[in-house]
Structures are given as structure tokens and as C-alpha cells.
């Protein structure tokens, strides 16, 4: 450990006296004096993008198979919900792991989650998990 004696030789040249510091506030010449920073007119600072349109269920373009990426996201999301205290949609037989419970719910098609698939034209399709087929079970 270092003793206080080791630091006795240090000069305080690197430290500036607080009394020498001056606070300078620069005013923006372009801004009128009566404008506050908390104005409600902040809409002009950003651009809104068009929302995509939903494709009707009867006109789905994509396949009804759940991809491994969708499966991973659905299971992870549902496991997090279960871990945070969401009600379980299946009968528990001693399972305590939220991920195992989510897998059991997915096998029985009881997960209350909708998968949204975005299409290249900006539109999207909503698929309930009970309508998607699981290929690798």
C-alpha cells in the first residue's frame, strides 16, 4: 500500500483553482429570447415514415411454417413472460424452467403470441403461433 508520505512531494500544478473558473453561457443569435427548450413544437425536428399495411389473412404470401429464428424468438419471449409471472397456458407436471414451459406451450399450440413477418414492399403479415406449422419437432 502507498503511504501518505509518498504523495507529499507532489506539486499541485495540475489542479486549477475553482475560483479562477468562470461560467460562460453563450446565447444562440438565431433563437428568439422567448423560446424555451421544452416547447411542444418538436414535431418539426424529425420525419415520420409511412407505416406498412397489413396483408389480410386470406391473402398471405409467405409459407405457414415457423422458421427456426421465429421459433427462437417466440420461445425466448414467452419464457421471459413466464419468468416475470405471466399465467401459464398448459398443465404443469413439475416443470419449473420457464423455457421448458414455453416449449410445452408451443408443442400444444397454446402460446398467445403473434409473429409479424415484414415483406419487401413494406407491408407485413401477422401469423398467430397456432396457425404456424412446426417442422423440426
Curated annotation (Swiss-Prot):
Component of the RNA polymerase I (Pol I), RNA polymerase II (Pol II) and RNA polymerase III (Pol III) complexes consisting of at least 13, 12 and 17 subunits, respectively. GO terms for cellular component: RNA polymerase I complex; RNA polymerase II, core complex; RNA polymerase III complex. Keywords: DNA-directed RNA polymerase, Nucleus, Transcription. GO terms for biological process: regulation of cell cycle switching, mitotic to meiotic cell cycle; transcription by RNA polymerase I; transcription by RNA polymerase II; tRNA transcription by RNA polymerase III. SUPFAM superfamilies: RPB6/omega subunit-like. One of its GO terms (molecular function) is DNA-directed RNA polymerase activity. Pfam families: RNA_pol_Rpb6. DNA-dependent RNA polymerases catalyze the transcription of DNA into RNA using the four ribonucleoside triphosphates as substrates. Common component of RNA polymerases I, II and III which synthesize ribosomal RNA precursors, mRNA precursors and many functional non-coding RNAs, and small RNAs, such as 5S rRNA and tRNAs, respectively. Pol II is the central component of the basal RNA polymerase II transcription machinery. Pols are composed of mobile elements that move relative to each other. Residues 1-27, 34-43 have a biased composition (Acidic residues). Belongs to the archaeal Rpo6/eukaryotic RPB6 RNA polymerase subunit family. Residues 1-43 are annotated as: Disordered. It is found in: Nucleus. InterPro entries: DNA-dir_RNA_polK_14-18kDa_CS, EF_Hand_1_Ca_BS, Pol_omega/Rpo6/RPB6, RPB6, RPB6/omega-like_sf, Rpo6/Rpb6. It comes from the Eukaryota. Signal peptide: none annotated. This is Probable DNA-directed RNA polymerases I, II, and III subunit RPABC2. Its main location: nucleus.
Amino acid at each position: 500500500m502507498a503511504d501518505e508520505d509518498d504523495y507529499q512531494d507532489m506539486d499541485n500544478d495540475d489542479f486549477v483553482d475553482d475560483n479562477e473558473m468562470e461560467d460562460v453561457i453563450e446565447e444562440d443569435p438565431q433563437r428568439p429570447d422567448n423560446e424555451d427548450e421544452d416547447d411542444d413544437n418538436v414535431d418539426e425536428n424529425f420525419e415520420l415514415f409511412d407505416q406498412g399495411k397489413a396483408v389480410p389473412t386470406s391473402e398471405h404470401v409467405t409459407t405457414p411454417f415457423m422458421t427456426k429464428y421465429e421459433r427462437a424468438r417466440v420461445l425466448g419471449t414467452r419464457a421471459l413472460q413466464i419468468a416475470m409471472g405471466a399465467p401459464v397456458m398448459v398443465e404443469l407436471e413439475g416443470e419449473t424452467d420457464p423455457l421448458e414451459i414455453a416449449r410445452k406451450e408451443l408443442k400444444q399450440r397454446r402460446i398467445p403470441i403473434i409473429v409479424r413477418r415484414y415483406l419487401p414492399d413494406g407491408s407485413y403479415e401477422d401469423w398467430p403461433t397456432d396457425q404456424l406449422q412446426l417442422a423440426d419437432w
